[in-house]
């Protein structure tokens, strides 16, 4: 059952918030041991469900929260041994807003350590399996949230997107994932990876559920100086006819895709034309180089952000006879991929190489953004694949560069700050395929309106993996 359908049933008195919480908790306990979507569950869930006011706008809805988003009183690990027992004394703004409207945190979902990865294989605890094929990855780094949705272990989820970490797992698991305009959702309480790129993003199994979630979490926040004063009107934007829109298909993303992705793109273009959109091919010339710039800028910011984990203030502290030895031993607890990115980031920020790498990457970022702004003077939306192929098998991307190439089509939205939405667009065999829409800065609602029209024309909502009995 979809989130807006659950909410309607609660409002009519057909089911109570407690009954909803009990049903999802039972399903998680039955199915998640074989899936690994959750790192921890909210032990007070049923108590909180019994106490919630059923008249609140989101009463009856439980939310799976990625485990790099702070939840007061509930363990928040960022998928790292370094924060294995960290219980935040504060709440992320996005979580606080959900709770104020009656939603409940079901549990914390698995991720690549500190959000650094594209498969959830880099979690310090265990990998998450793709509900459509247990031998394949769910994507990352928000793989636990995507898998929980696809298996119907939760009706709504929060992830975070630094270079595609909401959209890529959404594509691999056949769900919706939105990377909002940078600043549209407060980052307060999100454990930082790369602060100029990070963004909390909603995930769901229908566009209406995505709009419900965005209306709850978006909006300005005095605790985040980068948050935007843009009132959310997502559910309102879904009403009425689809306006005439100009759709640009990004030429640089048309080659090298798998047959299923190519077929999904062709079918989507046919649907959008039938919906009245004018379609043309456009060029975003710098997009193929965006990946190289991203893997300079993101590690550079990570090396600064992760310097705080020295064992002196919070997190796990390794033993050492002196402070320096203790700090070295503590940081040795970082996983291999985190160490790799911190080393890269430290190198590109070093005095001898700063301008050659970091300075040039920042200049490229400005050029990429200028090109995108020019494109949106010609079209209203951009369309490209979310990933070049469906989910890959575990262990298939052992070469770090091969794993980094998974972000080829997604990093552009992060570097430019633009909103981007991955939506289910078909299958390659038994594996879901996702496509991606981008809109101009601040026009997140436009993405959802176009995706809803596609969803209604193709019956893509309610897609879930065939696991267990349906709720």
Curated annotation (Swiss-Prot):
It is an enzyme of class 6 (ligase). One of its GO terms (cellular component) is glutamyl-tRNA(Gln) amidotransferase complex. Coiled coil: none annotated. The keyword ATP-binding applies. GO terms for molecular function: ATP binding; glutaminyl-tRNA synthase (glutamine-hydrolyzing) activity. InterPro entries: Amidase, Amidase_CS, Amidase_dom, AS_sf, GatA. It catalyses: L-glutamyl-tRNA(Gln) + L-glutamine + ATP + H2O = L-glutaminyl-tRNA(Gln) + L-glutamate + ADP + phosphate + H(+). Pfam families: Amidase. Its EC number is 6.3.5.7. Heterotrimer of A, B and C subunits. This is Glutamyl-tRNA(Gln) amidotransferase subunit A.
